Amino acid sequence: MKSLTSAEIRQMFIDFFKEKSHSVEPSASLVPHEDPTLLWINSGVATLKKYFDGRVIPDNPRIVNAQKSIRTNDIENVGYTARHHTFFEMLGNFSIGDYFKKEAMEWAWEFLTDEKWINFDEALLSVTVHPEDDEAYDIWLNDIGIPKERIIRIEENFWDIGEGPSGPNTEIFYDRGESYGNDPQDPELYPGGENNRYLEVWNLVFSQFNHNPDDTYTPLPKKNIDTGMGLERLTSIIQQVPTNFETDLFMPIIRETERISKRKYGNSEAEDTSFKVIADHIRTVSFAIGDGAMPSNEGRGYVLRRLIRRAIRFAKDLGVNEPFMYQLVPVVGDIMKDFYPEVQKDAGYISNVIKVEEERFHETLNDGLIILASIIEEERKKGSEVFPGEEVFRLYDTYGFPKELTEEYVEQQGFTVNQAGYDKEMNKQRERARNARQKVDSMQVQDTIFTEINVDSTFVGYDQLQKETTIEALVKDKNQIEEANQGDVLYVFLKETPFYAESGGQVADNGWIYSENASAYVSDVQKSPNGDHIHQIEIKEGSFKINQPVHAVVERTFRNHVIKNHTATHLLHQALKDVLGSHVNQAGSLVRPERLRFDFSHFHGVTAEELQQIELKVNEKIWESLPVAIDSKKIDEAKAMGAMALFGEKYGDIVRVVQIGDYSIELCGGCHVINTAEIGLFKIVQETGIGAGTRRIEAVTSKQAYDYLNTKLDLLHNSAQKLKTSEEQLPERIEGLQVELKDSQKQVDSLSAKLSNLEASSILDEVKEISGVPVLAQEVNVKDMNQLRSMMDELKQKLSSGVILLAAENNGKVQLVAGVTKDMLEKNMHAGNIVKQAATVCGGGGGGRPDMAQAGGKDPSKIKEALQSVEQYIVDTVK
């Protein structure tokens, strides 16, 4: 067996199959862009379904790849076992209707045993086959020459991971030797059993069937080969280490974690688990974020958030109590740079995303862990080993603890979670969310009547704003009708329509429908389930009938403003990528005539300087008068051109490609200007965050941008007039006023302090003795809590011995301060307790040190009663 690095093993695998006339398929993004059945790309074959199910014919039926993959169905096992990972690489060779079992098996054996390649000792390899797969058994036995005692028939040898290709499989196992298991009584000590001695190296699937969405199986058009070999596991065998984590794919990460934590890997099993969790999870989140996923509270984002927070929790066991994972990203990039240079290239961006997420969780982590520990302690005192489900929900809802993280933590403490209690609280939250939703009269929820209507309707509004057409159907009160009259509000289907139906963020057109003796206002247009345009109308005059000729007219000014804003969003999208980075992707948009809104992925707020650069880039492209070309292309051709496809959007075989000069190219079904010069002007009015990793820009164009700037100029002009200066000198004038205000404030503070001292001196006469303790309890007139504390300091200096309680009313609220001199502390007087008792009387709360404390209250009418409370406190304390 050769001594090889993981990079050499990966390249050797690809080179071997290139010699066997295979084409190399590049590793696809971890985020599936064309497969809604998958959360992540989870295998080498996942990206090749289109070939296996016959939808697409590859140029070469022989394919080889090294595919990055994510599986998260058993996150809780990662770190505790030798080979569980959330991120891994799958080496695979594939045949689409070309070679089949014999070639696949012989080539696998050649790669593993030939001295030119891996050069395993043949005697250490065993294989498994499906009990009914006699063909595979015979090939192993007679063609390749494996002794029959090393060929095991196993019922589980049928590969099926849900929708997609499936079929019988054969697996190759490597014997690591007796040091990993030698008990002849162990029923699992055989290739394919649950043991650490015989490691599965390679899985060869003979794909003969397609697993359909309805769980039926149909024969594939041609027999195919789908193989998979985990790079991490193969590397552990070749590098002769006990687990995958000791390979060169993980050890540099572990070494860097050692440096950060000042702990050593290999010293304790518990700490080793933490090292493994961190090393695995940083690989996953680095690659996933690099491929466009972002931490959030749902879907893929929730998986990333859970992994980051799980790693942070385990890092605490290594003494790491601050953000650290972001420091590991360059290490991941360096390990993988030969085959995946993009991680190293985007390391800065990936690190920033992770750091922001770490900082966010650290803000609440300690509080959450303290609460976790206290709840466990309380339950133990009760003799319970069940962690309350409602507390699991509270930790998630308040402190951002993923449910799975809490479950894992409490299980380590010997507890189980009350799932029913958690479900009950989650259902309550869902009900609250449902009740909070605004109920609107919209066509977003389609009635069955719209599903039943299937007319021959065509949209012609890309280049026509009015059209002679025919009424195909009328719908009122969920029923088709023959005729509608003045005052009716209903829905109409047209044979041909110039009205754009709301989609892709662009709002629907409005306008009018006319006949010889009737008119109707079109207020909304939506798409029916069958793709036809449904026009919501109100008949202003006359009546309309089925099959009646009509004249449909889009409101031109409305549409003109909309298309300017829509084209501007395309320019903005590209400008964001130029300024902030290629990671920026559209997350939503709204295109209205008066404004545009654009949501995009980014890990922190956009600076004022960046916003200026973005705005300038968009305007420069407007002023360059770039032509806007719109063409229909095949989807593959459009993507080859570099057209941006929006994640989550579904596209047909033919798509509209909107190209703005040589600056922007996107797939888009909306309406646009002919030349960017028509937009005139672009102005950003606001940038905000709308969720973790998602930002929003709102902007105006054309006349609205002109009006917006004029409003700002008017404000500037009026402000200058009021301050009796010119617009150019306004900043200087404001600075001067700020200096004057600061000086005036100092004078006010000085006078207030003097008045406070005078008042302090005047109320010293109000001191009275309670149970031998001098007491001053008084309502005073001050402007804020700072002045109240200053008065307290003054009084404590002047009153050599005693207890003081001061109260003030400001803005309808009660402010309280208590003070105790040093000698009174020895008599157990406590300012914190005094002020807390007084605040309770006023409907508030507070506390503090024994010598000085403050509090607040809600009811000023109770001030007198609150001041009197100190007397009873002293009587009780002196006793």
From Swiss-Prot:
Cofactor binding, note field: Binds 1 zinc ion per subunit.
One GO cellular component, as annotated: cytosol
Keywords: Aminoacyl-tRNA synthetase, ATP-binding, Cytoplasm, Ligase, Metal-binding, Nucleotide-binding, Protein biosynthesis, RNA-binding, tRNA-binding, Zinc
InterPro entries (UniProt xref): aa-tRNA-synth_II/BPL/LPL, Ala-tRNA-lgiase_IIc, Ala-tRNA-ligase_IIc_anticod-bd, Ala-tRNA-synth_IIc_core, Ala-tRNA-synth_IIc_N, Ala-tRNA_ligase, Ala_tRNA_ligase_euk/bac, DHHA1_dom
One Pfam family here: tRNA-synt_2c
Family listed: Belongs to the class-II aminoacyl-tRNA synthetase family.
HAMAP family the UniProt entry points to: Ala_tRNA_synth_B (MF_00036_B)
Protein name in UniProt: Alanine--tRNA ligase
Organism phylogeny: Bacteria, Bacillati, Bacillota, Bacilli, Bacillales
